[in-house]
Amino acid sequence: MFFPIVWLSVLLIISKSFAREIRLSRATYNEDDEEIQEVAEKAMEQVNDQTRYRNLYKLVRVISAQTQVVAGIKYYLTILAAPTTCRKGAVGMNPMKCTIDSSKPTKQFKIEVWSAPWQNTFKVTLT
């Protein structure tokens, strides 16, 4: 009787440790993955809200991408963005339709995106 209880206890401890490790580890994604591209494009609105530059930035490409399962999905992205000729604050302005201002340098951003669609949550943080 003693042996099965010990065995089950050991299995429980191992499974909890393994589950925690899976939950806390990050997975590397291909930068061209469709999901990653969609998240990066959607994140640009909040990136533009958080920058001090007077014009909008436009996503050029995703440089690197990792994900982590938390209470939702956390995306760790490094993106390259280019300044555009479109001013911030213009009603209905879509940076994807703006012209890149080639006289200004591109900028690399490291961002964290927390997405929990069932809670209607999509939060972007510049790091």
UniProtKB/Swiss-Prot annotation:
The listed location of motif Secondary area of contact is 68-72
Cellular component GO terms, alphabetical:
cytoplasm; extracellular space; vesicle
Question: Does the entry feature the keyword Translocase, yes or no?
Answer: no
Family matches, as CDD domains: CY
Q: Residue span of the signal peptide, if any?
A: 1-19
Which keywords describe this protein according to UniProt?
Answer: Disulfide bond, Protease inhibitor, Signal, Thiol protease inhibitor
InterPro entries this protein is in?
Answer: Cystatin_dom, Cystatin_sf
Q: List the disulfide bonds.
A: C86-C98
Annotated GO molecular function terms are: cysteine-type endopeptidase inhibitor activity
Q: Which domain of life is it from?
A: Eukaryota
Coiled-coil residue windows: none
The family classification in the record reads: Belongs to the cystatin family.
Summarizing the function annotation, the protein's role is: Cysteine protease inhibitor which inhibits members of the peptidase C1 family. Does not inhibit asparaginyl endopeptidase.
Protein name as it appears in the record:
Cystatin cpi-1
Species the sequence originates in: Brugia malayi (Filarial nematode worm)
Q: Which gene encodes it?
A: cpi-1
